[in-house]
Design a protein with these regions (language model features):
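N-terminal capping/linker segments that flank leucine-rich repeat
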Residues: 3-8, 12-133, 372-415
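Tandem repeat scaffolds
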Residues: 25, 68, 95-98, 111-411
Length: 415
């Protein structure tokens, strides 16, 4: 084994170790300032681990890096962290910056406790479809603007404080990625794969995300606004405390998704599937759910205002302890639905199927049970004015106008 790749003997003094290290690796991997962050007794172990990493880099053909090699390098950094004073691997980061001059080149900077360990420009391999392969990288503080990243692969990536702005990300793969405080601003994400991602405090603003797979994704506290989600799949997605604002999402699949404690305003869910969705303690305002499925959906403790659910399947839906204002359920199926301890203001049940419903209405402090067979015929019961609730009257002519206005308001700000 040549001198450049040899290990320092344990019999050498600390002075000899430092000398040999400086001689063979100065300005290449790590300096004494970085080493000083580790315990003195651990210098030999640190140098040995870094030398292993250096040999891996030296073995790369033309500077290219593979998934397997990247995993090995990352593991060595984790091993190094275990010997650090803090024994924390979260202080180790790989920061990646896309080069505007050379589209396929990025600068990778390794940090240990905020000290630069290794600088290198490597070529990101292209995928078979022409995109770039960023898979399994740890990308912190990355900012990519106005780039074509279509067909790229970010599978298994860890993205922290990342920004993608004005990018074409058609058919991009984020499968199993971990995202913390990520922003997609004015990006094309159509036909992309976000299945099983873990996103915290992420934002999609003014994006086109049609036909996107969000299957089993964890997106708590996500902020999605002015975005198109047509035909996208959120099956069993966890989206607690999500904020959806001015979103076009016809035919979207939210089957068994969890949107508890969420806020939804100005949404077009026409022909959508929200069956078995958990909307406990959510706020729904100005929602178009015409001809949609809400079978066995949980709307407990929920506030609904100006929600249009005409011609929808809402059998077995649970409205217990909910507040409903200016909502339309005419011509919908509400068989065996539950509305116990519910407050209703200007709610339209014309021609709805309400057989087997369990209903008790809160009026002031009084809880009044109602026979479901007479619910529709007692429409005037829900026509009272309330100073804290305003809305359109219950005429059939106004229902389509309300739905069209909701969609028009969304489109006005989504262009």
């Amino acid at each position: 084994m040549n001198d450049n790749h040899s290990f320092t003997s344990s019999s050498h003094t600390k002075k000899t170790k430092s000398y040999n290290y400086s001689k063979h690796h100065k300005n290449t991997l790590i300096d004494n300032k970085a080493l000083s962050l580790f315990k003195m007794d651990d210098h030999e172990k640190v140098i040995g681990l870094i030398q292993k990493m250096k040999r891996i880099y030296d073995s790369l053909p033309s500077g290219k890096i593979t998934k397997e090699t990247d995993r090995k390098i990352h593991k060595h950094f984790i091993d190094i962290a275990l010997y650090a004073n803090n024994k924390c691997d979260d202080r180790i980061t790989r920061r990646v910056y896309l080069s505007k001059e050379k589209e396929v080149s990025i600068k990778v900077v390794y940090f240990i406790n905020n000290v630069a360990v290794h600088n290198n420009t490597i070529e990101i391999p292209q995928t078979v479809n022409g995109g770039y392969d960023f898979s399994h990288l740890s990308l912190k503080g990355i900012v990519i603007k106005d780039e074509d990243l279509s067909n790229s692969n970010f599978a298994g990536c860890r993205l922290q404080n990342a920004i993608f702005q004005d990018c074409n990300m058609y058919k991009t793969n984020f499968y199993y990625a971990i995202m913390e405080k990520i922003l997609f601003d004015n990006c094309i994400l159509d036909d992309s794969n976000f299945a099983q991602i873990k996103m915290a405090d992420g934002t999609l603003n003014a994006c086109s995300a049609m036909h996107v797979q969000f299957y089993n994704a964890a997106m708590n506290r996500a902020n999605i606004k002015n975005t198109f989600l047509d035909y996208s799949n959120f099956y069993i997605a966890y989206m607690a405390e999500v904020n959806l604002y001015k979103v076009i999402a016809p035919y979207v699949n939210l089957f068994k998704a969890d949107l508890s404690f969420s806020k939804l305003d100005l949404i077009n869910f026409e022909h959508a599937d929200l069956s078995r969705v958990n909307l406990n303690k959510a706020i729904l305002q100005n929602i178009n759910l015409i001809d949609s499925k809400l079978f066995c959906t949980w709307l407990t403790n929920t506030f609904l205002e100006m929600v249009i659910c005409t011609d929808s399947n809402m059998a077995n839906v649970n409205f217990n302890n909910a507040n409903l204002s200016n909502c339309h359920f005419n011509c919908s199926i509400l068989t065996k639905a539950c509305m116990f301890n519910t407050r209703l203001y200007r709610v339209n049940f014309d021609e709805a199927s309400v057989q087997g419903m369990g209903i008790s209405i809160l009026r002031g402090e009084e809880n009044i049970p109602i026979d479901s067979d007479t619910l529709v015929t007692r429409q005037k019961f829900f026509e009272e004015d309330c100073t804290s609730h305003t809305g359109m009257s219950q005429t059939e002519d106004n229902i389509n106008a309300v739905a069209m206005k909701i969609t028009a308001d969304i489109m006005q700000h989504a262009d």
